[in-house]
Amino acid sequence: MMTSPAPPQGFEPHFRRSPLTEPWEPIYSQRTNDRVIIGLYARDTHTNSRGMVHGGLIAALADNAMGLSCVQVLTAAGRKPEGGLVTVSMAIDFIGAAKLGQWVAFDTQYVKTGRTLCFAQAFVTADGDVIARADAKFRVT
């Protein structure tokens, strides 16, 4: 098993754990008023049979980063969703690959909130190079 180095400055152990992401730990995050950036070092448990980070992991953590970023924006605007958010739709374009040992970051670059919906876009990078772009729509509950 590969040991992960310390995360980049500003990142701490991810505050939101779930049974889905438990096997992918350690996962880190960085919070601001308008977004949550999630990151991890690519390990064997993150990869497909070709040694690249699996698209399912990329999609799941992009969804997580965008949803949490929507909550950050809504909360900063005094509209913290009591019931959280539910993903309505999500599209992802895979334009590169992450390999073992790379720092993979899920950074939400755009959030627009409405009364019942929140729209977000995220970019996924591997050591700073864009490998995926995701768009999602969330229902505010």
Q: Where are the predicted features?
A:
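Terminal targeting signals and extreme-terminal segments of soluble enzymes
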Residues: 1-141
